[in-house]
Amino acid sequence: MAHIEKQAGELQEKLIAVNRVSKTVKGGRIFSFTALTVVGDGNGRVGFGYGKAREVPAAIQKAMEKARRNMKTVALNSGTLYHPVKGAHTGSRVFMQPAHEGTGIIAGGAMRAVLEVAGVRNVLAKTYGSTNPINVVRATLDALDSMKSPEMVAAKRGKSVEEILG
C-alpha cells in the first residue's frame, strides 16, 4: 500500500493503493497498473478516483483527475461527525461515530485517508467484512453521505434547529 500526500493549492491528495494487473492474450500477458486516490479540501469536500494505465505515474494522474471531478460535500461538526453512521458497498461495511476533541482519527487504511482529506479530525471508525481499498473508500463515502446535520433534519421536518436539538 503506497501513501503519497501532496497539497495542490488548497486540495490534499492522497494515494491509497497502486496495483499491478494483467490481461492474458494469445502472446502472453499485458501488464498495467491501477491507482486509487482521494482528494479533499480538509473542510468537508472529498472525492475519490480510480485510474488505470500502462505506467504507474499515468495511472496516478488519471486517478487524481477523476477524484477532483467527483468531489462531494459532506456535513461536518467542527472536525467530527454529527452522529454515528454506517455505510456499505458490496462486501465492505463501515461504522463511524463522533469522538471528543483530542481523540484523533482512529481508523484503518483506506478509511483513514478519506477521513483525513475530508477534514475529519476526531472519529472512531471500524471496517467490517472485506477490506478491499476500493470498496472501503466507497463504503466510507456512503456513510459520510448518509450523515445529516441538525439544519438538514430541521428543514426536512419543518421545525427549528432548537426543537430538533431539544
From Swiss-Prot:
UniProt cross-references to PROSITE patterns, sorted A to Z: RIBOSOMAL_S5, S5_DSRBD
Taxonomic superkingdom: Bacteria
GO cellular component terms given for this protein: small ribosomal subunit
SUPFAM superfamilies linked: dsRNA-binding domain-like, Ribosomal protein S5 domain 2-like
Molecular-function GO terms, alphabetical: rRNA binding; structural constituent of ribosome
Pfam (any one): Ribosomal_S5
InterPro entries in the record: Ribosomal_Su5_D2-typ_SF, Ribosomal_uS5, Ribosomal_uS5_bac-type, Ribosomal_uS5_C, Ribosomal_uS5_N, Ribosomal_uS5_N_CS, Ribsml_uS5_D2-typ_fold_subgr
Annotated keywords: Ribonucleoprotein, Ribosomal protein, RNA-binding, rRNA-binding
Residue stretches making up the S5 DRBM domain: 11-74
UniProt entry tagged with the keyword Hydrolase: no
GO biological process assignments: translation
Disulfide bonds: none
Subunit annotation: Part of the 30S ribosomal subunit. Contacts proteins S4 and S8.
Family, as annotated: Belongs to the universal ribosomal protein uS5 family.
NCBIfam families named in the record: rpsE_bact (TIGR01021)
Free-text comment on this protein's domains from its UniProt entry: The N-terminal domain interacts with the head of the 30S subunit; the C-terminal domain interacts with the body and contacts protein S4. The interaction surface between S4 and S5 is involved in control of translational fidelity.
PANTHER family, sorted: MITOCHONDRIAL RIBOSOMAL PROTEIN S5 (PTHR48277:SF1)
Functional summary from the UniProt entry: With S4 and S12 plays an important role in translational accuracy.
Protein name: Small ribosomal subunit protein uS5
